[in-house]
Amino acid sequence: MKKSIKKISNIVTQITVGEPDFPGVSPPNMWLVAGFDRCALIDTAYGNVDEIDAFVEAWNSVGSLPLSDVILTHRHRDHIGGIRSIRDISGAKILCAPEEHASIVEEIGDVFINQVTDGTKLHLGGVTLEILLTPGHTFGSLCVLLDQESLIFTGDTILGGSTTVISPYHGDMSDYIDSLRKIKSKNPKNLAPGHGELITDASKRIDAYIKHRIYRESTIVKALDEGIIDIDGLFIKLYPKLDSRLHQTARDQILSHLNKLVSEGRVQVKNDGTYGLIA
């Protein structure tokens, strides 16, 4: 299985194992951040043997400093699957946002997980990480600021190679756009995503993400104005040549945008489940 352990600075190591398992999305990253006397890990990938071995190799490369914290950016399996193995190896505390706690425990089992709040700081000895709550991709997605390197670890809020998915069932499009603006307000130079390579043009990438969402919303509003009234019709209009493996994801994105428009009072859901603009 393909393995990459890459030091992107004296402080940060990127750990990636495997091949893409979804069109356009690279394998999940783990990010190891080393201070002078302890270190922290951001996300744990799926937790398969090769991923855990790669983590141990990277950990050894920083002198096996005590691993004080494992920060989970959100609830999805490809970011939390290694919790038990890494906790058992290191004794680290597991941290997540309150909104993700129940889902993570349900997925992984009875593991004690500490809940963090916006602005929580973790001191690693000369290195400080700050938690940024950035809901949207999921209700409890978070990012992590490493201010001294002008770097934000973004989980799946911003990806290395594509736009991210906003679930209409456990995420929120309005929150997501607000979170993108929050990340931009921190003025990072670089972004370390949950999938893909380091992003070195942070402001440009964030602007592109915001622009994409505004554009997608405008195309939905235009289609509704033209008389297209349901998700099937919107899907055909907006995604005429999409890879079939992404069809359900695209439908979910349409629904997420519609949910936002409904919450803003710009669109109504009719009794038959169709949608219409509010004049």
What is each stretch, according to the model?
Residues 39, 46-49, 128-219:
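Metallo-beta-lactamase
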Residues 55, 195, 220, 261:
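Residue-level signal for inorganic ion chemistry
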Residues 3-63, 143-155, 160:
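Conserved beta-strand hairpin/beta-sheet module of binuclear metal-dependent hydrolase folds
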Residues 73-79, 137, 195, 257:
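Histidine-centered divalent metal-coordination motifs
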Residues 80, 176, 180, 254:
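Aromatic/hydrophobic pocket-lining residues that form the small-molecule binding cavity
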Residues 26, 46-128, 150:
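Active-site HxH/HxHxD metal-binding segment of metal-dependent hydrolases
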Residues 222-279:
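C-terminal regulatory/interaction regions
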Residues 21-22, 113, 133-135:
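Short Gly/Pro-enriched turn/cap motifs at secondary-structure boundaries
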